[in-house]
């Protein structure tokens, strides 16, 4: 982790961090994933089983988790944890219900009408990271908006551990969220199964959910066969702070991101020299006894940054350039600072709003754009699992009144048959 007090050097470092997923192995990874996808496309379940054994160490037979096992997982979950899952479920559901887009109709002066109609996709596939990890919150954040959208069938894939078991809490979250089918598979082969369909797994219309570089590459390659939510990179947090912020709290928030992944990025932009040093010291003090010490060290060492800025305006300028996935504003007046923020996936205001609040139960989705993509995209939501159609209806009068303009525009583009398709309707 570097401490930098030059705006220009800080900008250079932020750009380096933003490009941290760029790798010389991309061609090799693409080739591996392409081969896996092709095998799944042509050999279905046999290929899925083959690669699950190769990469995860077990044959997924049966591949699907039974409805009974899902219910049992919920029943066996600790009562306190069940309550927490239910609280999160209700808050996330309430927020996403407000996201449902409205269809509308505009009636023209001469009897014509145009409509926008929103409809859910029929089938959705959710990818939930697994193996040694367990992320029930990711189940909630993907399944709830799909359910709110009105998706008829939600299929979830998640890799099992070395014994082929999916974490009980992950299964409990799937049961609570109304996931219809759960399969004990992961990796690029699972993405291929969802995209192309197999005898056991129905082809889906949209795939959502985060994964490693192989999963992300698979999502990129199957886009066009099916829809995807986004191409998520490693997680990141940027904190804008002034001297009123608590240095220990900032250090904890930075490490809450670093513990995710060696490629996770934790950044502090502060107006205080003293605070910069205090946070630096506190970060390494906490790391010494951290249960994920090695991951934190790699993340902080390679992708951590503390930049000292002349004022909050400079902090905001650097933040907007970086476009962070998570942005915390811990200043004397966070709402005033917020007014100048242009690019961020999710924004957390004040010292009582650590990023973990958004990860678990605030309500907004925690699947957010990374690596600068917040400049042009936002979070996963209900619309991820919906599509819209335009419905257009003209009558004789409205077409006749507009015919001259349509014909003029068609002729300007050299499209004779377009123009003639209007003319012919008024010929005797």
From Swiss-Prot:
Cofactor binding: number and manner: Binds 1 zinc ion per subunit.
GO cellular component: cytosol
Cofactor: Zn(2+)
Positions that bind substrate: 235, 257, 260, 326, 359, 413, 418
Top-level EC class: oxidoreductase
Catalytic activity: L-histidinol + 2 NAD(+) + H2O = L-histidine + 2 NADH + 3 H(+)
Metabolic or biological pathway: Amino-acid biosynthesis; L-histidine biosynthesis; L-histidine from 5-phospho-alpha-D-ribose 1-diphosphate: step 9/9
Active-site residues annotated for this sequence: 325 (proton acceptor), 326 (proton acceptor)
Alphabetized Gene3D superfamilies for the sequence: 1.20.5.1300, Nitrogenase molybdenum iron protein domain (3.40.50.1980)
HAMAP family: HisD (MF_01024)
Function as written in the Swiss-Prot or TrEMBL entry: Catalyzes the sequential NAD-dependent oxidations of L-histidinol to L-histidinaldehyde and then to L-histidine.
Name of the protein in its database record: Histidinol dehydrogenase
Gene that this sequence comes from: hisD
């Amino acid at each position: 982790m570097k401490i930098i007090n030059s705006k220009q050097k800080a900008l250079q470092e932020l750009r380096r961090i933003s490009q941290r997923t760029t790798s010389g192995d991309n061609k090799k990874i693409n080739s591996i994933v392409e081969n896996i996808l092709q095998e799944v496309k042509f050999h279905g379940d046999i290929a899925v089983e083959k690669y699950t054994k190769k990469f995860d160490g077990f044959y997924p037979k049966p591949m699907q988790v039974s409805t009974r096992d899902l219910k049992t997982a919920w029943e066996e979950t600790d009562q306190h944890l069940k309550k927490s899952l239910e609280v999160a479920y209700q808050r996330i559901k309430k927020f996403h219900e407000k996201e449902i887009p409205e269809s509308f109709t505009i009636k023209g002066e001469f009897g014509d009408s145009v409509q926008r109609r929103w409809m859910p996709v029929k089938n959705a596939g959710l990818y939930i990271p697994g193996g040694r990890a367990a992320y029930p919150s990711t189940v909630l954040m993907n399944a709830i908006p799909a359910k709110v959208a009105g998706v008829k069938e939600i299929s979830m894939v998640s890799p099992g551990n070395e014994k082929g078991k999916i974490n009980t809490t992950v299964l409990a979250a799937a049961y609570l969220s109304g996931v219809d089918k759960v399969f004990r598979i992961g990796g690029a082969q699972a993405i291929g199964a969802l995209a192309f369909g197999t005898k056991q797994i129905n082809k889906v219309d949209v795939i959502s959910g985060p994964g490693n570089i192989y999963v992300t590459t698979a999502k990129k390659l199957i886009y066009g066969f099916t829809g995807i939510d986004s191409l998520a990179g490693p997680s990141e947090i940027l904190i804008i702070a002034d001297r009123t912020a608590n240095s220990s709290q900032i250090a904890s928030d930075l490490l809450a991101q670093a513990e995710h992944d060696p490629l996770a990025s934790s950044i502090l932009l502060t107006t205080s020299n003293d605070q910069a040093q205090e946070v630096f010291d506190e970060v390494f003090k906490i790391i010494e006894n951290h249960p994920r010490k090695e991951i934190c060290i790699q993340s902080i060492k390679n992708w951590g940054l503390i930049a000292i800025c002349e004022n909050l305006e400079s902090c905001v300028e650097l933040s907007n350039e970086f476009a962070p996935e998570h942005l915390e504003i811990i200043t004397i007046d966070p709402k005033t600072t917020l007014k100048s923020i242009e690019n961020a996936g999710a924004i957390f205001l004040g010292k009582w709003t650590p990023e973990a609040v958004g990860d678990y139960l605030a309500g907004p989705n925690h699947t957010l754009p990374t690596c600068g993509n917040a400049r042009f995209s936002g979070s996963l939501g209900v619309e991820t699992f919906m599509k819209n159609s335009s419905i257009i209806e003209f009558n004789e009068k409205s077409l006749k009144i507009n015919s001259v303009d349509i014909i003029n525009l068609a002729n300007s583009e050299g499209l004779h048959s377009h123009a003639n398709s209007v003319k012919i309707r008024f010929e005797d």
